[in-house]
Amino acid sequence: VLIEQGLVPEKDEFVLRLPINTSGGDARFYSLAMPVYKDRAYIPTVNDISIGTQTLPLSPLVRIEALAAKTLEEQTPARVSRQILRLVAKEKVRAELARSGGDVGNILANLYNLASEQADTRSWLTLPNQISVARTQLTAGDHVLKLANQNDINFTVSKQGLTLIYLTSINNYFNSHVVQL
């Protein structure tokens, strides 16, 4: 039995407004926006299943939320470097607009810089939060799988092979597939 539960959470945005003095002695405000995952522990809704008289605990195979958070953490140094390069480039554009457009150009460039700074919050939103597995040996024939708060799943185990029961549980959505391997 393989079960997907929940969805990977979406990324949030952390914005830091930094007052920095330029080489000319002027104070400027710069924005730094980074994607973050808020600390939300995932609690699976299904922890065990029953087949006949057997109760089988589900063992987590992978927690994709943890993989997503680890990937984001590993990408942070490169993201910070890119953000610093963007700030330098935006400051160059602002300085040129201030030179050519005076105070109006300077104000417009600063407003654009503050408004345009957004973190890349694209996420793994369509992936399950956790994938778990349960294994057991059954005799050939008809069996019933029971889950809390779900309809029973009737399936047949053939004499020659394996039977995979693939379950998806996301919020109020539930689906099952039985595959003879």
Question: Which ranges hold each PLM region?
Answer:
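Short loop/turn and low-complexity linker motifs enriched in small/turn-promoting residues
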Residues: V1-L181
